[in-house]
């Protein structure tokens, strides 16, 4: 780094301490180095530091099959060993399974890891990945403020950006903070995006999803799913995702076509949770046991219902002093299976381009050239998965030769350059 860098003496605010926001902050500090004046980077997040089981209780895939995947990013950040230690599966691709409604399973397959990566994919609870990134940020001295949301945005007369900060607990306005660059990583329902791109809204995929985390004390996981994860496919337009979250917990997510999206309740009650379980049992009657057992053993505090939403990515040529990364730019439905990988790479790449470029516009333009096509590939693949998982004309060959599982999980992503 030279001493004449355009970011010297500048203030950067990151809205959102999720995967994308923390990957950005960590790599920016790493790339910036110690031999120039330090950057002033502050991260705000509307959530508390503690875990919300309904939002953080599931696990996700981190891939290491290509250079631009999540595990490679985490290795570059020095966090790979911690992620592998925290994973519930360290050989996730070979454990991926497609079951039919009677639990006949597809053969396993594998994909080589990229370079010297120790594995091609892991499954890790979202809460564990979040904690690893938070602790890394705290250890690096990155300033993170919890329960503070970035509510409003304006361009100031001096060319900087003004951000109104609100206490997420009591709703009180804290202050208006000025900065030279705002990195919006505030999720699929980004408030910053609503202000700057009010027509760029989430689109309903046609799928509703409900599920939770079933508990099996003493390792009494049903043999059908033990040490596996994947999808139950039927020929009834309904499917179910299954994945371990711990030695005793299994996340399940039932999905089906529904004409209009349903919103989750404003407040959760025991009665509503039980009604969701009853609906899940009714909708999944076509799936043989142990699925009913899985539903009945679900921890009520982990139950969820959500509409499958997504949106296309966008570039920043008409925006000034603000960059959207992760879900705030390109939201994926859960069936995309690649959201965390793309978010990690977004954060990492933006930091790298800001440190390498000679001006902010060049950095953001190069970021767009890499991030937008990457997100579009994941979005297109997500729509293919949604269609194949909810067909009424199931291809039985995928249960005999393993090609169905390979196509469903990896598709064309492994061959992307």
From Swiss-Prot:
Recorded protein name is Monooxygenase cfoF
Q: Where is the composition biased (Basic and acidic residues)?
A: 389-399
Binding residues for FAD, per the UniProt record?
A: 45-48, 126, 327
What pathway annotation does it carry?
Secondary metabolite biosynthesis; flavonoid biosynthesis
Which top EC class is given?
Answer: oxidoreductase
Keyword list, A-Z: FAD, Flavonoid biosynthesis, Flavoprotein, Monooxygenase, NADP, Oxidoreductase
Identify the stretch(es) annotated as Disordered: 389-417
Instruction: Give the gene name.
Output: cfoF
- Coiled-coil residue windows: none
Q: Which GO terms describe its molecular function?
A: FAD binding; monooxygenase activity
Enzyme nomenclature, EC number? 1.14.-.-
Null allele outcome, as annotated, is:
Impairs the hydroxylation of the flavonoid skeleton at position C3.
Which family does the similarity line name? Belongs to the aromatic-ring hydroxylase family. KMO subfamily.
């Amino acid at each position: 780094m030279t001493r004449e860098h355009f970011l010297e003496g500048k203030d950067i605010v990151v809205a959102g301490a999720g995967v994308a926001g923390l990957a950005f902050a960590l790599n920016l500090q790493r790339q910036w180095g110690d031999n120039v004046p330090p950057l002033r980077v502050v991260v705000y997040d509307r959530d508390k530091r503690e875990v919300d089981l309904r939002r953080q209780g599931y696990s996700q895939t981190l891939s290491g099959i290509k250079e631009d995947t999540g595990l490679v990013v985490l290795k570059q950040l020095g966090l790979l060993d911690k992620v592998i230690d925290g994973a519930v599966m360290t050989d996730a691709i070979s454990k991926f399974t497609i079951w039919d409604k009677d639990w006949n399973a597809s053969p396993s397959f594998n994909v080589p890891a990229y370079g010297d990566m120790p594995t091609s994919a892991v499954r890790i609870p979202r809460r564990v990945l979040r904690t690893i990134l938070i602790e890394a940020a705290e250890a690096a001295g990155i300033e993170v403020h919890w329960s503070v949301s970035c509510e409003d945005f304006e361009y100031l007369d001096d060319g900087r950006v003004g951000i109104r900060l609100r206490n997420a607990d009591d709703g009180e306005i804290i202050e208006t903070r000025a900065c030279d660059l705002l990195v919006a990583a505030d999720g699929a329902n980004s408030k910053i995006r609503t202000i700057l791109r009010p027509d760029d809204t989430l689109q309903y995929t046609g799928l509703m999803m409900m599920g939770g985390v079933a508990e099996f004390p003493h390792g009494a996981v049903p043999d059908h799913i033990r040490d596996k994860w994947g999808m139950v496919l039927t020929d009834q337009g309904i499917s179910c995702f299954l994945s371990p979250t711990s030695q005793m917990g299994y996340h399940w997510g039932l999905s089906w076509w529904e004409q209009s999206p349903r919103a989750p309740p404003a407040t959760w009650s025991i009665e509503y949770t039980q009604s969701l379980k009853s609906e899940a049992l009714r909708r999944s009657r076509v799936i043989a046991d142990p699925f009913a057992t899985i539903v009945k053993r679900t921890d009520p505090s982990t139950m969820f219902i959500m509409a499958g939403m997504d949106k296309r990515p966008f570039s920043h040529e008409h925006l000034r002093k603000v960059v959207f990364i992760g879900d705030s730019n390109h939201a994926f439905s859960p069936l995309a299976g690649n959201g965390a990988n793309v978010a990690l790479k977004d954060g990492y790449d933006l930091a790298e381009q800001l440190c390498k470029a000679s001006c902010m516009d060049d950095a953001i333009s190069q970021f767009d050239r890499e991030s937008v096509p990457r997100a579009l590939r994941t979005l297109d693949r997500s729509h293919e998965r949604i269609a194949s998982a909810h067909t009424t004309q199931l291809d039985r060959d995928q249960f005999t030769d393993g090609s169905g599982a390979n196509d469903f999980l990896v598709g064309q992503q492994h061959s992307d350059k």
